[in-house]
Amino acid sequence: MKEIIASNYSIWIGENSLSKLNVGSYSKIAILVDENTKRDCLSKLPKLENPIIIEIQSGEEYKNLATCDFIWQELTKHNFDRNSLLINLGGGVICDMGGFCASTYKRGIDFIHIPTTLLAMADASIGGKLGVDFNHLKNQIGLFANPKSVIIYTK
């Protein structure tokens, strides 16, 4: 396993990288997935204590404010506070949406990216750029915010 220090967060790469999923003393934890990552990847994560699973539809057409509203509603429904964590398990849409929603919910909660596609591993999960599409234009609303860590599982 290899650790890369990027700005102020670690990027863990390797077959044992999921062991670096540090949820610390967060008050609540949610995992953002789509139907594909829920089916194929969620079971690979280490067991977490009572995580909330937030499932959105897969595809670029769902990377919008309506989906953000759904994510924010779920976080609110489950009483997430500023000491909560959102784990983004998926490709570029999940990383962009999850990071954007976490960074804007209650003026920012922590998030961790666990990218599941090569493009997300090389682009969407690193660099801190987060955005959603608006009026059918890509990444029209966004911001820059870094995750607590990026975990790239290679097994």
Segment roles from a protein language model:
Residues 2-3, 78, 103, 139-142:
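Short secondary-structure boundary/capping segments
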Residues 68-73, 91, 103-104, 119-123:
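Hydrophobic, well-ordered secondary-structure scaffolds
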Residues 106-155:
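A glycine/threonine-rich phosphate-anchoring loop and its flanking beta-alpha core
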Residues 40-43, 97-99, 123:
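Short glycine-/acidic-enriched loop or helix-start segments at secondary-structure transitions
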Residues 44-48, 68-69, 101-104, 126-129, ...:
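Short, glycine/charged-enriched secondary-structure capping and boundary segments
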Residues 1-85:
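ATP/NTP phosphate-donor binding region
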Residues 81-101, 105-117:
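A short, small-residue-rich loop immediately preceding and capping a beta-strand
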